[in-house]
């Protein structure tokens, strides 16, 4: 889990496109805090802080504290909008949470040991089916990423959720099927059976 942080914010007295454009001209981004059966709270946060938090990674899996006047509100960033042309943030949605909250969150998938994966060393291609996995997790213990070790995968293998060790109290939202996260695809012009034969030959040679 990434380290929590604090964002300073100001209440927005006005909402709408005109007000939002004015905020952005002055270095702020319009945002809203919602959830926990409370009325939505319209706020403005620093453009620079949000920009760096988003592009540093882990933005939507890290709990933050928003300081608004005398209030300190624990939140989880749930969504953000980017300018369609220039890719800078223009709006953020925050969900109210507590230390006891359990939330649905998209956790990124990270693959490691590509350099030792048998399938990739033989020219196979890592075909990522899911870059993120929708999970249910405690708000105060959301993992930064789901780590998958590729060192034992060969060409033709599939990586399913059932073989992934998730952190304690983290479960996938999808429970009715063993969905695929990634596969090791054969390179163009190669059949999976060719690689299987080569693997068997390697094993036989190792025994002699």
Swiss-Prot record:
The record's annotation in CDD domains points to: Ribosomal_L25_TL5_CTC
Molecular functions per Gene Ontology: 5S rRNA binding; structural constituent of ribosome
Task: Look up the coiled coil feature and give its residue ranges.
Answer: none
For whether the record's keyword set contains rRNA-binding, the answer is: yes
Keyword annotations from UniProtKB, A to Z: Ribonucleoprotein, Ribosomal protein, RNA-binding, rRNA-binding
Q: Which SUPFAM superfamilies match?
A: Ribosomal protein L25-like (SSF50715)
A Gene Ontology biological process annotation? translation
Subunit architecture: Part of the 50S ribosomal subunit; part of the 5S rRNA/L5/L18/L25 subcomplex. Contacts the 5S rRNA. Binds to the 5S rRNA independently of L5 and L18.
Q: Record's NCBIfam families?
A: bL25_bact_ctc, PRK05618.1-2, PRK05943.1
- What's the protein called, per UniProt? Large ribosomal subunit protein bL25
